A protein has these predicted regions:
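GIY-YIG nuclease catalytic motif and its immediate N-terminal context
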Residues: 1-37, 41-68, 83-95
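Short arginine-rich
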Residues: 65-78
């Protein structure tokens, strides 16, 4: 069974990072319906900005935790697919 890690763009411009075993469509619908009480409930509607599929939920959760520790500029570079910028941002942080 596959799993996903995803970044949602919220109505207020913020990002939400999550993971799920459900289909992305189903999970996003849950966020937008208000069924999930938490960060996104007051920031609807949300839209999918980025996702990655994993074979195991444990790998998706590990990536979710990593992404939650990233600054906004790194998340934006990932969403845009700018892998070179990600490397530069990571190197800048280590200096």
């Amino acid at each position: 069974m596959s799993a996903f890690v995803y970044i949602l763009r919220c109505a207020d411009g913020s990002f939400y990072v999550g993971s799920t075993r459900k289909s992305l469509e189903e999970r996003i619908a849950e966020h937008n319906s208000g069924l999930l009480r938490g960060y996104t409930i007051s920031r609807r509607p949300v839209t999918l900005a980025w996702s990655q599929e994993f074979d195991r939920i444990t790998d998706a959760i590990a990536m979710e935790r990593r992404l939650k520790g990233w600054r906004r500029d790194k998340k934006e570079a990932l969403i845009r697919g700018e892998l070179e910028a990600l490397s530069e941002l990571a190197a800048r942080r280590q200096r």
